[in-house]
């Protein structure tokens, strides 16, 4: 007897509440074993001896975990020793108490309901210490504690937890506001909990909750906006409280007072609430049970599970409010796969039908119906998921024959809520409901609506109401043929294209969708009318019918699946549902490490599993085993990524940087970085699946390598850590894509996710992926679209310091040619970066003939500035004069010639004259020289007409004799004479004013051995005759330009040309 008594005493746990029939599970044994081991090690030792011994012991991973759990056990079970133990653990912990926080998080999530009263109170004390000392990841413990603060529960135990968490949040408000996701979870949870605390005995707690919540909402409203439509639904239930009533008025009528970026209630209603917030309002145990019901219970066998659930969670009057939370969770989180749709598992609509029909509280019943149809009210087929509206139509469709009262009340509610939900914007609500019904018919969720809308089991008033609201759906479409009523044995099945695999337990602020509105104090309301009053909609009658086993048996064969329908992107259930799946026996080599990873979900266990998994050949797995491993690992990798702030807030602080790459996915990158050997096929399959299901993996890898190399180099300055592009190539190979395509896609996604991190990584990208990134127009466009003036400045600094090279000379012209279609601001930024690279003009000058004044003003502006710093050369002038002249001239060419004339007049005149003369060779005066084979006259070499056109437009710009010196030089004179003599009558007439600047050809031939008028003599540079001739010519040119203002350029007469020529001839004779 004594032995039996001692055995029973030994079984009693200080941490967990155990009955005589309870057996210890692995978690309980692990905690108590660690406590006993720690006691044996430190028993009888002084503080100094204990610290020395433990400091050596914690160097081993296994002992470190045991010691951490042992200390945690003491702090949770012994209030008197807790402060000293906390000091001890801070001295010996080598991971910043990460092990303790991880185990405490798991303990709260899995075993909170079994903790003793002392342990619960010590948990609050320990949380307060963690928050006070800023222990990393304590927000995970807080979030799991918030989940344990259940709705619909006013027991003293639950109220103690709620008030304790509230006190921590109030005391450490600054710490709370530093974590936006925790702010969102806290506000969402307390707005929901305040609804349950209407009892006068709880008035002091309720007032404290209201004061804190309202203050947090108003001060951090920019963090509250992502809570979206379901936050509005919760606000509706507390709108009668004065503080919330004033908040409602500000949201509706003065939104800018809350936040300058907030545009009103519709902005919230267009945002889909993250699944994680919907999840946080269910107890973890309740979530596991409802997920098990929806994934493992066969249709027809569910009654005993429903009865147990009803007795467990709906036993008190306050618990009815839980039904709305459950329905929103089922609709938005539990999206069954195709395999489940094909099976005889109980469908979602049947569970929701049971939750609504078994509700005996009219207020909770109205709220439950609103939860069912909530996503209908603002449904947008282009954005929203049909799986969120499917249960509503199916529960009505399948109930119409045997439970018409269920269908009738739901139809009546849908008709009334469409009209009265938001009176001011009834048209928009109606569009959302119409979109829902239209997509339901298109996707064949049900064959047609006539069996439901025109059922003889509906009363006349309801049929009239349906006719008024859904007239468009009453006439059957021609292609549907005869009306089909749902059978009691089989119904039309469907496969729907669901959302791509999204992060189930994380915020989805980048993927926001539309929905609908509200519920207050248990009564459905219309938000506002013109008098700013809240109008009430009468609630429905209590529903008495329930879903019986008989009906379920008749409807057991529910889904007939079209095998040709593509539905590979089904959204999996949440992680808790995976725990309910039967375990698969795995090879001994990975069984232990895989189980450790699944339970702990950290980088250390993940890398240990990878080390065991990588060398295994394909023969080590059956197909189902490999699929089991891959599906679980991919899901865990996604779920353990942070929902917000995935990147470090600081680019210099080592703690922030290290924390940002501490998640299991980064463990994969670290493993690949440190292990270069070739992988076996199973590992390659795993890598491919990760790449497919986690699209962000590419840019997260780039981010990891930047930080990892930075941190490792700081730790060991003797060794250089390289940015290994081979790892990125592995990822690209696993995704079966070219590295260039992957890089551009990943950088595009990264820029949209976080512009600062994208620009931070940019120098590394251009350095490590030089062959792909340099002169890459697509990457350049991604960069230019996101930068502002400060970013341009930083890029220029990096280029000037040699840290960043965006362009190389070879091929640059093609890059700039493609950039001509960019936006104006982007092009101006581009030209600044080009200029910072000191690109010589010769590399891009071939673009000059292609640029058009109307289409490419940015490029022409920059080219003009470049030309001002260049001397005119034969090549540049050739390209400029190859530009196609317009009827009104080319201001670009004219501007360039004008400023060159100020410094290089003679040189410019000689170059143009030489170019013009080359068109009229002396050997063939009547034929123009043909261009070399393969060179286009119009683009490479300017034609004579192009040169003359540009000279003519330049002449017109030279008013009052300014800039006319270009034409007085000897070579230009001879070139114009040659052009005149070789031109036809049409050309001579067109350029008559230009040709008038040169003497006629016969005046240039004298009797002194062909020495022409005005030519320089070989032996005398300052010949008097030449000086006189130049002076006379200059005066003549000035006379021509002066007379040009008073005469029409188009009406030059032949007689005027002759008179001018005679005056020039007389002047020449006088000079001779």
UniProtKB/Swiss-Prot annotation:
Disulfide bridges in this chain: none
InterPro entries assigned to the protein according to its UniProt record, in alphabetical order: HEAT_Ints3_C (IPR056518), INTS3 (IPR045334), INTS3_N (IPR019333)
Keywords: Cytoplasm, Nucleus, Phosphoprotein
Positions of post-translational Phosphoserine modification: 1042-1043, 1047-1048
Main location: nucleus
Pfam families: HEAT_Ints3_C (PF24566), Ints3_N (PF10189)
Domain of life: Eukaryota
Subcellular location: Nucleus; Cytoplasm
Region (Disordered): 920-941, 1002-1072
GO cellular component: cytoplasm; nucleus
Family according to the record: Belongs to the Integrator subunit 3 family.
Subunit note: Belongs to the multiprotein complex Integrator, at least composed of IntS1, IntS2, IntS3, IntS4, omd/IntS5, IntS6, defl/IntS7, IntS8, IntS9, IntS10, IntS11, IntS12, asun/IntS13, IntS14 and IntS15. The core complex associates with protein phosphatase 2A subunits mts/PP2A and Pp2A-29B, to form the Integrator-PP2A (INTAC) complex.
Functional description taken from the UniProt entry: Component of the integrator complex, a multiprotein complex that terminates RNA polymerase II (Pol II) transcription in the promoter-proximal region of genes. The integrator complex provides a quality checkpoint during transcription elongation by driving premature transcription termination of transcripts that are unfavorably configured for transcriptional elongation: the complex terminates transcription by (1) catalyzing dephosphorylation of the C-terminal domain (CTD) of Pol II subunit Polr2A/Rbp1 and Spt5, and (2) degrading the exiting nascent RNA transcript via endonuclease activity.
Designated name of the protein: Integrator complex subunit 3 homolog
Organism name: Drosophila erecta
Upper lineage: Eukaryota, Metazoa, Ecdysozoa, Arthropoda, Hexapoda
Gene: IntS3
């Amino acid at each position: 007897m004594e032995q039996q008594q001692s055995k029973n005493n030994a079984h009693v746990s200080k941490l967990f509440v155990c009955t005589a029939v309870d057996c210890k599970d692995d978690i309980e044994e692990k905690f108590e074993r660690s406590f006993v081991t720690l006691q044996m090690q430190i028993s009888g030792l002084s503080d100094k001896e204990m610290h020395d011994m433990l400091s050596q012991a914690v160097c081993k991973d296994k002992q470190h975990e045991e010691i951490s759990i042992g200390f945690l056990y003491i702090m949770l079970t012994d209030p008197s020793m807790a402060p000293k133990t906390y000091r001890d653990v801070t001295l010996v912990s080598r991971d910043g108490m990460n092990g303790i926080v991880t185990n405490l998080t798991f303990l709260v999530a899995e075993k909170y309901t079994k903790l003793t009263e002392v342990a619960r109170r010590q948990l609050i004390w320990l949380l307060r210490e963690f928050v006070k000392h800023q222990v990393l990841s304590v927000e995970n413990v807080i979030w799991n504690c918030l989940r344990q603060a259940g709705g619909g529960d006013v027991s003293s135990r639950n109220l103690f937890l709620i008030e304790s968490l509230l006190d921590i949040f109030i005391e450490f408000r600054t710490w709370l506001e530093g974590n936006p996701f925790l702010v969102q979870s806290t506000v969402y949870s307390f707005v929901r909990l305040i609804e349950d605390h209407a009892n006068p005995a709880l008035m002091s707690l309720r007032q404290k909750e209201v004061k804190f919540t309202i203050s947090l909402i108003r001060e951090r409203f920019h963090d509250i906006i992502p809570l979206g439509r379901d936050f509005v639904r919760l606000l509706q239930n507390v709108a009668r409280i004065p503080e919330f009533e004033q908040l409602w008025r500000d949201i509706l009528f003065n939104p800018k007072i809350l936040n300058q970026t907030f545009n009103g209630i519709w902005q919230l209603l267009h945002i889909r609430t993250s699944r994680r917030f919907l999840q946080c309002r269910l107890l973890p145990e309740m979530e596991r049970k409802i997920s098990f019901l929806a994934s493992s219970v066969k249709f027809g066998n569910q009654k005993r599970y429903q009865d147990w659930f009803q007795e467990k969670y709906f036993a008190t009057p306050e618990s009815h409010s839980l039904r709305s939370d459950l329905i929103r969770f089922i609709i938005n989180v539990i999206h069954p796969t195709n395999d489940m749709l094909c099976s005889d598992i109980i469908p979602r609509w049947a569970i929701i039908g049971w939750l609504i029909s078994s509700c005996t509280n009219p207020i909770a019943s109205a709220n439950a119906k609103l939860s069912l149809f909530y996503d209908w009210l603002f449904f947008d087929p282009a954005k929203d998921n049909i799986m969120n509206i499917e249960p509503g139509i199916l529960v009505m469709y399948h109930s119409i024959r045997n439970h018409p009262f269920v269908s009738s009340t739901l139809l009546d509610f849908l008709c009334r809520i469409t009209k009265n939900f938001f009176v001011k914007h009834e048209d928009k609500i109606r569009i959302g409901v119409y979109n829902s019904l239209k997509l339901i018919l298109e996707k064949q969720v049900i064959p047609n609506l006539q069996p439901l809308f025109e059922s003889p089991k509906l009363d006349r008033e309801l049929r009239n109401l349906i006719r008024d609201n859904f007239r468009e759906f009453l006439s059957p479409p021609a292609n549907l043929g005869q009306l089909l009523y749902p059978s009691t044995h089989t119904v039309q099945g469907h496969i729907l294209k669901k959302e791509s695999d999204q992060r189930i337990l994380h915020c989805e602020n980048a993927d926001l969708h539309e929905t609908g509105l509200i519920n207050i104090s248990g009564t459905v309301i219309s938000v506002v009318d013109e008098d700013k009053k809240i109008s009430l909609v009468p609630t429905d009658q209590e529903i008495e019918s329930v879903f019986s086993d008989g009906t379920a048996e008749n409807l057991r064969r529910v889904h007939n699946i079209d095998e040709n329908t593509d539905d590979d992107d089904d959204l999996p259930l949440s992680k808790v549902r995976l725990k309910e799946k039967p375990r698969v026996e795995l090879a001994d080599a990975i069984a232990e490490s895989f189980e450790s990873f699944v339970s702990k979900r950290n980088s250390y266990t993940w890398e240990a599993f990878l080390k065991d998994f990588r060398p295994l050949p394909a023969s080590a797995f059956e197909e189902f085993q490999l699929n089991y491993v891959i599906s679980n690992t991919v899901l865990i990798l996604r779920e353990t990524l942070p929902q917000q702030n995935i990147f470090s807030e600081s680019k210099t602080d080592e703690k922030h940087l290290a924390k940002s790459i501490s998640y299991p996915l980064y463990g994969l990158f670290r493993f690949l970085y440190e292990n270069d050997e070739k992988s076996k096929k199973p590992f390659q399959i795993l890598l491919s699946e990760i790449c497919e299901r986690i699209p962000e993996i590419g840019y997260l890898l780039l981010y990891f390598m930047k930080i990892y190399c930075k941190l490792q180099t700081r730790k060991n300055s003797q060794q250089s850590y390289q940015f290994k592009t081979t790892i990125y190539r592995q990822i690209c190979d696993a995704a079966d894509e070219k590295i260039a395509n992957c890089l551009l896609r990943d950088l595009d996604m990264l820029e949209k996710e976080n512009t600062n991190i994208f620009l931070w990584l940019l120098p590394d990208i251009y350095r490590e992926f030089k062959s792909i990134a340099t002169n890459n127009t697509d990457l350049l466009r991604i960069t230019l679209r996101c930068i502002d003036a400060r970013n341009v400045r930083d890029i220029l600094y990096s280029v000037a310091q040699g840290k960043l090279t965006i362009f190389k000379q070879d091929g640059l012209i093609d890059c700039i040619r493609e950039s001509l279609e960019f936006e104006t601001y982007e092009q101006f930024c581009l030209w600044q970066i080009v200029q910072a690279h000191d690109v010589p003009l010769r590399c891009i000058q071939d673009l000059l003939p292609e640029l058009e004044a109307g289409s490419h003003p940015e490029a022409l502006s920059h080219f003009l500035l470049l030309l001002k710093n260049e001397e005119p050369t034969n090549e540049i002038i050739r390209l400029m004069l190859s530009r196609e002249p317009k009827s009104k001239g080319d201001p670009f060419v004219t501007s360039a010639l004008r400023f060159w004339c100020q410094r290089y007049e003679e040189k410019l005149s000689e170059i143009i004259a030489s170019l013009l003369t080359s068109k009229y060779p002396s050997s063939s005066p009547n034929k123009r020289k043909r261009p070399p084979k393969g060179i286009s006259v119009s683009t490479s070499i300017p034609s004579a007409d192009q040169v003359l056109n540009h000279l003519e437009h330049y002449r017109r710009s030279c008013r009052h004799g300014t800039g006319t010196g270009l034409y007085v030089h000897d070579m230009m004179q001879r070139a114009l004479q040659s052009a005149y003599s070789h031109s036809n009558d049409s050309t001579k007439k067109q350029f008559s004013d230009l040709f008038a600047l040169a003497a006629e050809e016969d005046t240039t031939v004298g009797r002194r051995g062909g020495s022409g008028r005005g030519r320089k003599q070989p032996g005398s540079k300052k010949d008097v005759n030449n000086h006189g001739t130049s002076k006379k010519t200059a005066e003549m040119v000035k006379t021509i330009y002066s007379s040009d203002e008073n005469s029409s350029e188009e009406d030059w007469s032949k007689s005027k040309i002759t008179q001018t020529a005679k005056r020039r001839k007389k002047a020449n004779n006088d000079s001779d």
